[in-house]
A protein has these predicted regions:
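A beta-strand edge to alpha-helix "cap/lid" segment located at domain peripheries
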Residues: 19-56, 61-151
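Positively charged n-region of N-terminal signal peptides that target proteins for export
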Residues: 1-4
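Bacterial N-terminal signal peptides
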Residues: 6-16
Length: 151
């Protein structure tokens, strides 16, 4: 009887350990990584107020939808970045949806301290134009669970 209980305990411990292991992360496809890197470079340029880099990264026919639903264009976006973003603005949890070999949506979450709402879901559409990735469209959606946060 003792042997059976010991064997059963060993099986249970082994099964528990096996199930508690987190699965290894899947490698990010090269296409997705390229777009995530492009998105991060764009956000870093915006934080650093590198307006020349920001301007180059945005397509001339860019359109965006603001948190309140208003439409805006390239000039509005570049002008808004002149004021700067809080230095502790964070972007995380990047996901890429490939549309074609030359276009994709990069969705991610963003925290902008001091802004209302400070928690946002971002969706940026990138297109390869003349061999360069450029931002064509952006939609900003407030994170509903935090839309009324006053900070």
């Amino acid at each position: 009887m003792r042997g059976i209980l010991l064997a059963l305990a060993t099986v249970l411990v082994s099964a528990t350990l096996a199930l508690s292991q987190t699965p290894s992360s899947k490698p990010v496809p090269a296409f997705d990584q390229q777009l995530i890197d492009q998105q991060k470079q764009f956000l870093e340029a915006a934080l650093a107020k590198n307006l020349a880099a920001v301007d180059r990264a945005i397509a001339s026919d860019f359109q965006g939808i603001e948190i309140n639903g208003d439409l805006y264009g390239k000039a509005d976006l570049v002008d808004s970045l002149q004021a700067g973003m809080p230095p502790d603005t964070r972007a995380y949890d990047f996901h890429v949806v490939k549309l074609t070999d030359a276009s994709a949506v990069v969705a991610y979450n963003q925290i902008v301290p001091g802004a209302n709402p400070r928690y946002r879901h971002m969706a940026d559409t990138w297109a390869k134009i003349d061999g360069q990735w450029q931002l064509k469209f952006r939609q900003i959606t407030p994170n509903l669970w935090s839309a009324t946060d006053l900070d």
